[in-house]
Structures are given as structure tokens and as C-alpha cells.
UniProtKB/Swiss-Prot annotation:
This is Alpha-conotoxin-like Qc1.1a. InterPro entries: Conotoxin_a-typ. The cysteine framework is I (CC-C-C). Alpha4/7 pattern. Residues 22-46 form a propeptide. Alpha-conotoxins act on postsynaptic membranes, they bind to the nicotinic acetylcholine receptors (nAChR) and thus inhibit them. Has possibly a distinct nAChR binding mode from other alpha-conotoxins, due to a different three residue motif (lacks the Ser-Xaa-Pro motif). Expressed by the venom duct. One of its GO terms (molecular function) is toxin activity. The keyword Signal applies. Pfam families: Toxin_8. GO terms for cellular component: extracellular region; host cell postsynaptic membrane. Residues 1-21 form the signal peptide.
Length: 67
């Protein structure tokens, strides 16, 4: 195999890896968004619930880390 052919194969491999990496990154964006939304909801619930003693007592798994 000549040098041009080897270089062409190298470029094709790099292109294929880039395409696969790019598409898999975009596929995970939906999962990341869902996880971020869940974390935001838990933080909002914690901020509202933990200062309230009855709510804090009924949700120890949410509030115990700060006490």
C-alpha cells in the first residue's frame, strides 16, 4: 500500500471516529437534560422543605445532610 492510500485510510478512520463521537454526544443530551431537571426539582424541594420543621421531619433523606 502506498503512502497516499495509508494517509487516505487514516483520514477515513479519523472521520468515522469523529462522526460516531459527535452523534453519541448528541444522543446523550436528552438524558443529561432529564437528569439536570430532576436535580433542579430536588434542589427546589429541599430549599422549600428543609427550613420547615414538619416537612424536614417527614423527609429526613432530603434534609439530613445539612443537620
Amino acid at each position: 500500500m502506498g503512502m497516499r492510500m495509508m494517509f487516505t485510510m487514516f483520514l477515513l478512520v479519523v472521520l468515522a471516529i469523529t462522526v460516531v463521537s459527535f452523534t453519541s454526544d448528541h444522543a446523550s443530551d436528552g438524558r443529561n437534560t432529564a437528569a439536570n431537571d430532576k436535580a433542579s426539582n430536588l434542589m427546589a424541594l429541599r430549599d422549600e422543605c428543609c427550613p420547615d420543621p414538619p416537612c424536614k421531619a417527614s423527609n429526613p433523606d432530603l434534609c439530613d445532610w445539612r443537620s
